[in-house]
Amino acid sequence: MLKILVPTIMLIPLTWYSKKQWVWINPTAHSFLISIASLTLLYHSTDLGYSYSSSFYMDSLSGPLLVLSCWLLPLMMIASQNHLMKEPLNRKKTFLTTLIILQTSLIMAFSSSELIMFYIMFEATLIPTLIIITRWGNQNERLNAGLYFLFYTLTGSLPLLVALLYLHSKIGTLHILTLIMNPKPMELSMPNSILWYACTVAFMVKMPMYGLHLWLPKAHVEAPIAGSMVLAAILLKLGGYGIMRITILTQPITAHVYYPFIVLSLWGMIMTSSICLRQTDLKSLIAYSSVSHMGLVIVAALMQSTLSFMGATALMIAHGLTSSMLFCLANTNYERIHSRTMILARGLQLILPLMCTWWLLASLANLALPPTINLLGELAVIISSFSWSHFSIILLGANTVITALYSLHMLITSQRGKFTHHLYPMKPSFTREHILMMLHMIPLLIISMNPKFILGITY
């Protein structure tokens, strides 16, 4: 594990000692090498995963998320270059350092074997993200968005800390491997049910579940491109990862208390998908689509079957790459027309035809077109939900249709139609942007061709 962690930490001195002309090239190139080295973590040798030391542990659930975290760091650096072009050198270096600290926290969160260490790293991701949103956001509303993000996350996380400390006093350890081997299940009682709610509410806020989602559109819309990418691609997945870890340990209570969460998530998917249909702001539309997709992951994580866990993992990885790519495309539009309003960007297909191709691919991946991994994940969740309750197929079917509608609405509104003449002169698309889109799309296609890379032994 240290082969990933130590080089990532060493990117900080590399950034500060780099000369002006190398300040982007050095960290980006080295972080890309780290991401390639992290691909070895996708090798799954055993059922239970493997423990690197008493502190680090990895299995077929945390491995793909770790690799996704490492893969996105160089992409965030590539995407942010234009946004920070006019900033002084020291501020560029501070920005890169904040990204690297965030990356380190994420790696340690996904690989921690102790639940208290996981909690500390889960909270540690909050500070760099808050700095990125409130310091490098575009509008003045970024301070309000940061406040929402801070208070929602902190309020949700406090019950989790209390619950973990109580669990530790009862069991004597919070080591994941020891807890998995613990033969004594939790008794079905009111205090234990409250304990379950306390454990899961922090992750429901992070996902976010419908009703606790108000911070997400604000944070996404006001964050700079790197902030939007890391929020959509990795930070939301911390919630899904936490639910899947905690609910296994609190059996058999989950099977008795998950009904309101599943019903609210299924209903929330329909509601947020419908909200997407009437959005005019491009980033806001992508943010609400994230809430809709994460509702599906919550449903899958609470089902507790092998198939639903497989679907949740596939959906998290697929959504991480797809939504990050959509935010990058929205950013390329914003850098040219200086507006997030979709109707003002119409007709861009005539001027930037290759960028329109990336828009088409990203939109099709978002609506889960065969044979993408998005479809595999959604099918796995739909099958396991149908076996849980036949009525769920109505809501899941409606959600699939609405997702296709808003994805095509986003594509047609922003790319087709009559070109607006107020957009002259328009900058051409750059090689940097095409490389960025390729690095999102290639992993998605490779995983779609061979899902065993991320699903491991469960597939």
Curated annotation (Swiss-Prot):
One of its GO terms (biological process) is mitochondrial respiratory chain complex I assembly. The chain crosses the membrane at residues 22-42, 60-80, 95-112, 114-134, 147-167, 194-214, 224-244, 257-277, 284-303, 308-330, 350-370, 375-395, 435-455. InterPro entries: NADH4_N (IPR000260), NADH_Q_OxRdtase_chainM/4 (IPR010227), NADH_UbQ_OxRdtase (IPR003918), ND/Mrp_TM (IPR001750). It is an enzyme of class 7 (translocase). It is found in: Mitochondrion inner membrane. Its EC number is 7.1.1.2. Core subunit of respiratory chain NADH dehydrogenase (Complex I) which is composed of 45 different subunits. Core subunit of the mitochondrial membrane respiratory chain NADH dehydrogenase (Complex I) which catalyzes electron transfer from NADH through the respiratory chain, using ubiquinone as an electron acceptor. Essential for the catalytic activity and assembly of complex I. Belongs to the complex I subunit 4 family. This is NADH-ubiquinone oxidoreductase chain 4. It comes from Osphranter robustus. The gene is MT-ND4.
